[in-house]
Amino acid sequence: DALPILKISEGGGLTVQQAVMNGELDLAMTALPVEEESALTTRLLFSHPLCVLVPRSGDWLEQTSVSPQQLAAHPLLIYNEDFALSRQLMQLFTRHHVKPRIAVRSGQWDFLAAMVQAGVGVAILPEPICRRLDEKTLRWLPLESDLRWQLGMIWREGVYLSHSAQAWLKCCEGFTLPE
């Protein structure tokens, strides 16, 4: 028996969504929500709040949360433009009439965290990622927003899925990570 070929690749959410829509990928795990006109079926796996990653010093020690308006006063370190979360943050800033001062864009959360430690600015990262960082030098505060980091599976509506893709979806059924 031949085993199915499984290819795992990494890319920003928008790049991955485009690959699924073009038929280059059968399905993918990506940030949700996707654009309504994308004709993609989605299955939410988990959802987490966003945090503002700051140095453990100065005025940040007095803060308990950070509003989108407060972020305008600080250089901002965020994900690359091909990340869905980056697009969602830009929409959040527009809704709150905030003009962000973007200092650094990266696809690597550990690089963004290192830049915060170096004093370059503040970053917006999902809470589970913040929990992996050094609490002695960094602090993460809730972002005052209903925006959440949601990850889920996507695939093209009404298109045949291979047996391996169907098996992977079945594997993901009921799979959620704790809040």
Predicted regions and their residues:
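Central regulatory/effector-binding core of bacterial HTH transcription factors
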Residues: A2-E37, K99, R105-Q108
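N-terminal winged-helix
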Residues: A2-Q18, E81, Q88, P126, ...
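Short hydrophobic/charged patches on amphipathic alpha-helices used for structural packing
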Residues: Q17, M21, T42, P68, ...
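Beta-alpha-beta core module
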Residues: E37-H48, Q63-T64, D110-G158
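Flexible hinge/capping segments at coil-to-helix
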Residues: A39-L50, V54-L76
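A bilobed periplasmic-binding-protein/Venus flytrap-type ligand-binding module shared by bacterial periplasmic
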Residues: L53-D59, G152-L161
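Thr-Gly-centered strand-to-loop micro-motif
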Residues: V54-P55, Y79-N80, I102, L125-P126
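Secondary-structure junction motif
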Residues: W60, P75-H96, L161-K170, P178-E179
